[in-house]
């Protein structure tokens, strides 16, 4: 546990006593996980604990991980509590690292990509390793609840709304591309040409940074300047790393709303998406015809003004901020 670092912060108070939780996040390597790392940093600060960064390659896996779960978990010796933020189910194996489970009286796990049924790990299915688990979409709840012995809750993807610095004066780009897109929207040069012909200002994908933190900073600058962010669900914007049939909300939608942007494209068709994404901030675009989509966007932009920008930010603050999710985790830990 020596790779954790102390953060100066105020613990949350529940049930008449301070609740402090350490936060472990697994670093999978590669780009694209910046939002998860940022969530972990916010969580450690908000919950008053240490932030512990664990390289994915150090997790027990295969035969070693299986053998570890054949024995009952060690009896905890302390009263400390731990939240494991797992980008994928396999990252829950963090509690199998030597000494981890003995150190904590209560361990919760929050699985971000919770849609993979085949990737619910043995450690989650085994009694005593986790006290509470959370998934990010209601559509995943039943399969996890049927597979694991501990309580399972739904905590949707959110955003650092409190930290999102944006003003109406910043909004100079009418359409900002972020992330994967359907084939007809994927060529930034072609879309830029079509947008110019339609009288729409367009910015292609943000540059990639040398680190996750730098990459995240580029993306946040793009959100800050955008009136609308281009985003399509996995049904129309396939990639080999996506689930082949399930749709789901990612950071593009929630971060866009945190910065007061419209989200233009096609919304994931899930119960949680319908709950947390406000219809007044969504613009349906064609996934097969860029010219048609740009006309749909232009119509929506005529209704996008400072009042709507403020309304979107207000919605995000009330429904999407990570800290409200973390308060639920702390409250559940206090009950236990």
List PLM regions with ranges.
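Short catalytic-loop micro-motif centered on adjacent basic/acidic residues
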Residues: 83-85, 109-110, 176-178, 313
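A charged, aromatic-enriched C-terminal amphipathic alpha-helix characteristic of glycosyltransferases
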Residues: 288, 299-333
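Conserved acidic donor-binding segment of nucleotide-sugar-dependent glycosyltransferases
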Residues: 250, 281-289, 300-302
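C-terminal helix of von Willebrand factor
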Residues: 144-145, 293-297
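Short, conserved loop/helix-junction motifs that constitute active-site signature segments
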Residues: 99-104, 124-128
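Active-site proximal beta-strand in glycosyltransferases
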Residues: 100-114
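Nucleotide-sugar donor-binding catalytic core of glycosyltransferases
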Residues: 4, 11-73, 78, 86-95, ...
